[in-house]
């Protein structure tokens, strides 16, 4: 008899497709892993297309990186772009979608796991009919963003095109997820987004306010957990490496705003995998491809 815990009965499924969101040509493994190296390596930045089987609705989970620098704030370009050395996908997201038979204009929602620039950017030019959704607490934390007195500034990394209170500045249709949150599996707060247990959005504290994970139910019946930046590598997830809390010169750093909460979230991800049989896909790690694909 299987010792795995059971999830509530589900009637729905979704199609999920891995999309190339670009990545980073960087030397800063030490930002991810305590005692990490400074050798050049490529850090992936995955995003996902999700289509609800019953309704036909098409959504995206994160957007990865764009080659268009105008989609980023001056603070991001000055403070994060150089060290990260980002590169966009080999094929733009819109063309990737067309290649699998989907019109970008049919995307009605982009759900951002969180508001960091390598996951989130203005979307109107690529997905004209899509609205953006963020986790609870994101908008007040990021408000008002980088534009002050109608001029871009270095004051904030957050993008006023999403977060400004001024309707003349805010160009993107966005809101926070608003609905019923309830315990599901090992998680304290999850939302049954389509109402048939095919796609759960999960509050995942630690990385930044409003941080999210998600879980999709594949037509095979398997569950794929989208861990995004809850955990930055499989090595950390497996306990082979620790989250970086200091740099090469012993300066304090951490990619998670609340490390204790992030560690609790990672433990819940482990429980989801080990006790509920879910498959884990992290935003910046390729190891899941061998398992899922």
PLM features: residue spans?
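Zn-dependent metallo-beta-lactamase
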Residues: 1-87, 183, 268, 275
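Metallo-beta-lactamase
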Residues: 4, 85-102, 106, 135-202, ...
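Core dinuclear metal-dependent hydrolase active-site scaffold
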Residues: 18-23, 35-37, 47-53, 57-59, ...
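Active-site metal-binding loops of divalent metal-dependent hydrolases
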Residues: 21-22, 63-65, 115, 138, ...
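A short helix->loop->beta-strand "cap" motif at the edges of active sites that frequently abuts
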Residues: 57, 127-131, 277-278
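Active-site metal-binding motif and surrounding structural segment of the metallo-beta-lactamase
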Residues: 70-134
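Cap/insert and terminal regions of metallo-dependent hydrolase folds
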Residues: 81-95, 220-293
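Active-site environment of divalent metal-dependent phosphoester hydrolases
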Residues: 115-121, 208-212, 232-236, 285-290
């Amino acid at each position: 008899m299987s010792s795995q815990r059971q999830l509530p009965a589900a009637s729905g499924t979704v199609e999920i497709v891995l999309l190339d969101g670009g990545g980073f040509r960087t030397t800063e493994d030490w930002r991810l892993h305590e005692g990490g190296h400074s050798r050049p390596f490529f850090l992936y930045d995955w995003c996902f297309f999700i289509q609800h089987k019953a309704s036909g609705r098409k959504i995206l989970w994160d957007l990865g990186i764009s080659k268009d620098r105008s989609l980023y704030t001056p603070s991001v370009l000055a403070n994060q772009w150089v060290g990260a050395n980002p590169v966009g996908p080999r094929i733009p997201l819109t063309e990737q979608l067309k290649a699998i038979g989907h019109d970008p204009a049919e995307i009605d929602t982009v759900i951002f796991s969180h508001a960091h620039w390598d996951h989130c950017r203005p979307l109107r030019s690529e997905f004209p009919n899509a609205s953006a959704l963020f986790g609870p607490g994101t908008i007040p934390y990021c408000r008002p963003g980088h534009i002050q007195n109608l001029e871009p500034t270095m004051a904030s990394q957050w993008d006023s095109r999403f977060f400004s209170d001024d309707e003349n500045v805010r160009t993107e249709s966005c809101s926070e997820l608003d609905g019923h949150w309830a315990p599901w599996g090992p998680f304290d707060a999850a939302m049954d987004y389509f109402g048939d247990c095919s796609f759960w959005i999960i509050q995942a504290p630690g990385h930044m306010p409003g941080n999210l994970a998600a879980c999709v139910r594949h037509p095979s019946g398997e569950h794929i957990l989208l861990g995004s930046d809850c955990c930055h590598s499989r090595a950390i997830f497996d306990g082979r490496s620790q989250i970086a809390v200091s740099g090469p010169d012993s300066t304090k750093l951490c990619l998670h705003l609340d490390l204790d909460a992030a560690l609790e979230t990672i433990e819940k991800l482990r429980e989801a995998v080990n006790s509920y049989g879910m498959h884990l896909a992290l935003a910046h790690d390729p190891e899941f491809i061998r398992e899922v694909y």
